[in-house]
Amino acid sequence: MKPTHVLRLLALAPGMLVAPAAFAGLIVSAPVDVIGNLPLATFTSRGYGTRTYKDWGNEPYIAVNPLNTNDILISSFSFNTSSTTMGANVFYSTDAGSSWTSQFSVPTPVNGLTIPNDWTFAYTSAGTLHGTVLGGNNIFQGATTDPASLAAWSYTGGGTRINTAASSGNADQPWIALQGGRVFVAYDDFHFNTAERIAVSTNNGTSFTIDNPINNGPQAVNTVNPGTRIATDNAGNVYSIFGTGSATATRGVHNVTYYLNRSSDGGVTWDFNGSSVVGGIVIDSGVSTQLCNMPACTQASNNWFANVNDLRGNITSIATDKTGSHVYVLIGKQDANGTDRIYLAAYQPLGTNLVKSSEIVVSPAGERAALPAITVKDDGRVVVMYETYGADGNVHVHVASSDDFGASIGSDIDEYTFTPLTLAQATGSTTSNREFGDYDFLMSIGDTFYGTFAGLGNVNAGGIDTTRLIDPFFFSGTDAVPEPRSLSLVLTGLAAVLWLRRRKKNMSEVLCRSCATGAGRKRRRWRDGRSQRVIERPLDTTPATWC
């Protein structure tokens, strides 16, 4: 080999040292069937497997205690306060999600009022759990230091609604986010047209003294649910996403426009109300299949997701990194072929503005996608969850990631696949329209992310059979970063290359792999036999050429 060839190989050594980070994927735990991992006595006594209602995972939400990440709460539509002499049921784990308990620990805020109609939860940095609950079309906020205790729960104002008087009896879909001592609760107000608002407490939920629109006020014509979602950063900002729509000639199909807004003063004013007539930055617009109301779809005739889930909470999600230097939104719209897909748009601050840096499609072509969720880990990596339904008749729950600030998707794992029940099988009702609910949810603490979704149970052992139930599932994950390569290993590899090239010069095209990245790189996916973690990394299959 000529000396110039040796230098060329040695010049690659620095790149070989840093290459593993670029090839990192995700390590995701096998999903845990929450109902399937309850104590047998609880499963039996509560009738999880014998009741007509089997939709225990409908609209799941997750909160993890940052002071002890073994403590995990998952909520869903399981037992409400009218079906128990105690509180409404949440699922609680104290061993990082390996096993679960049913805790009837969320009391009604007002005697005689049934909850929940909707609810979302979040932990403070001090380990206090906050929750916002919809009951009687009003919004309530409460907190507890012990999610397993009914007596430990307390509500703002002793059970006083926190939504405005004008919206009383017409509020919907509360969404919670925390920031220091602030508690933000976004909600929809249907008392006059369609409005999106935010209620704010500046004293850890003791009182709510701010309640303002997150845009320029009610929209006179809106044929979709706004899907109002919020997220906060550590720089004092709160961000919102919502959608507005107008009907097309096809029922359940709308022209939808999505908006992003930001408040830098705790929800008092919103920075981009002047950016559009509605108020907020226009993220994008397109045709979207959701909310089949005019005329209403039925179980026998519909265009619902997977034929069992009308999307009545829009197709939206939002997250930001801690510093507010990157804001990410997920939206749903059709591609050029008429397939409903999930899109990821990334924004960065530029002066006082937010500027879109990229927008990409996340979900695969030819498969309808819905129920997106997103989080940003402390290392800046973006993690996305979404569901698809295709010609195979199965729902596929995907976990994808981006390590270049949303410019591309680096990995996409098919975390769970199942065949949905019919709605009548899941709910015992011939008029129900949602088997999975309005959302899935992702969150992260440090560089670990946690997620929940509704799916067909997969446990049939020890007297517990969940294979005919729709259950909440739990999973967690982190980065699959290969161990650092030492310089000695690199030099050993180079020596081997030199030796092989001397033995067989015509093998150079085999030994000198391509430097190509991006679309030419496929993924390798396997599940570790001991931990049952899904591991995925890129697999270079591009033609071998000299770099």
Question: Where in the sequence are the language-model features?
Answer:
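Bacterial N-terminal signal peptides that target proteins for export
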Residues: 2-10, 486, 504
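C-terminal membrane-anchoring or membrane-association module
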Residues: 498-515
